[in-house]
Regions:
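Short catalytic/ligand-binding loop motif for oxyanion handling, primarily in non-cytosolic enzymes
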Residues: 14, 52-55, 93-97, 144-145, ...
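Active-site-proximal segments of metal-dependent phosphoesterases and phosphodiesterases across multiple
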Residues: 59-66, 161-201, 209
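Short, solvent-exposed loop/turn segments at secondary-structure boundaries
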Residues: 16-21, 56-62, 147, 179-183, ...
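Extended active-site neighborhood of metal-dependent phosphoesterases/phosphodiesterases
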Residues: 59-155, 192, 200, 220-235, ...
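N-terminal active-site segment of His-dependent metallophosphoesterases
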Residues: 1-67, 161-162, 285
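A short C-terminal boundary segment appended to hydrolase-like catalytic domains
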Residues: 248-285
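Metal-dependent phosphoester/phosphodiester hydrolase catalytic core
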Residues: 2-15, 37-42, 85, 122-184
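Active-site neighborhood of phospho(di)ester-bond hydrolases with catalytic His/Asp-centered motifs
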Residues: 6-8, 43-49, 84-90, 138-139, ...
Length: 285
């Protein structure tokens, strides 16, 4: 059995006027993830919004925050060969994130190699093989705000990897003008999810919403008519947001999820969300 740890929407160090203690929440998640699987994870994927690019915070402090998150995450791996893959979110400083990752994660391949078909794709792609699965991580530069994934990235995904064994990760979910709704507070149409995802993968993972959700979709319009796909939205570490409340109420309870599968090709993928319901906001007085 292989175990992948997905961490998302950490916003490390930001307190949003005292509403959150994101450093303490991160520490709580690290402890929980260690307890959940003491032997460590075969891979770790951090899907964005790691450190806020706050203009009131110095770049040196941002570097320290990224380094803290990356070094803590490295300690959650099964061994030193287990990959740690990260992608920027909309709140990250891409340059500082990349600088620190190059320092702390020397084995992490940034940039797109022409031999992998990613020349001029407009963003970055990271990938790693874990058992029978290929983990593909696309940053926001490869996702068009209205049309989903860019044509070139789509071409590579369709031709490079067997989609039955591809686990695709992004920060923001695939979106178009009808599909994407902030914090999922409006109807998310499963058929549209399926039509966007099915050409590339049957198991898709994202963050951004700070809201645990799984969308099971059957395609109706794509050439893969009748194919079942799943979109898994990871709980946020900073908070969970109730998309159905009047003002999208944010609850300072951290969460994450563990993805498991067997060695064999085409093996089923299982997602185990963890919400720290017993988390108590740290008293700062």
């Amino acid at each position: 059995m292989y175990n992948i740890l997905q961490l998302s929407d950490i916003h490390y160090g930001a307190d949003y006027d005292g509403k959150f203690d994101t450093a303490d929440q991160w520490d709580a998640v690290v402890r929980s993830a260690q307890k959940t699987l003491p032997t460590g994870y075969d891979a770790i994927v951090i899907t964005g919004d790691i450190v806020d690019d706050d203009p009131n915070v110095s770049d040196d402090v941002k570097r320290e925050r990224y380094e803290k998150v990356f070094t803590d995450a490295l300690d959650l791996r099964k061994n030193e060969k287990s990959p740690l893959l990260v992608t920027p979110g909309n709140h990250d400083n891409r340059a500082i994130l990349t600088e620190v990752a190059d320092k702390v994660l020397p084995c992490l391949q940034w940039g797109l190699k022409q031999t992998d078909g990613f020349k001029d794709v407009g963003g970055q792609c990271l990938f790693a093989t874990v058992g029978s699965k290929t983990l593909v991580i696309l940053d926001s530069g490869t996702v068009d705000p209205y049309k989903g994934i860019t044509k070139l990235a789509a071409h590579v995904l369709e031709n490079k990897w067997n989609k039955e064994d591809t686990l695709l990760f992004t920060h923001k979910p695939f979106q178009n003008s009808r599909l994407y709704h902030r914090f999922m507070k409006d109807n998310l149409l499963p058929a549209e999810v399926g039509d966007l995802i099915a050409p590339y993968t049957f198991e898709y993972f994202c963050g951004h919403f700070h809201h645990l959700a799984t969308v099971n979709a059957t395609t109706i319009n794509s050439r893969l008519n009748g194919v079942d796909v799943n979109m898994h939205v990871c709980p946020g570490i900073q908070c969970q947001i109730d998309p159905y409340s009047k003002d999208c109420v944010a609850i300072p309870i951290p969460g994450y999820q563990v993805i498991t599968f067997e060695e064999s090709s085409n093996s089923a993928v299982y997602v185990h969300p963890v919400i720290l319901d017993d988390y108590v906001v740290k008293d700062k007085t």
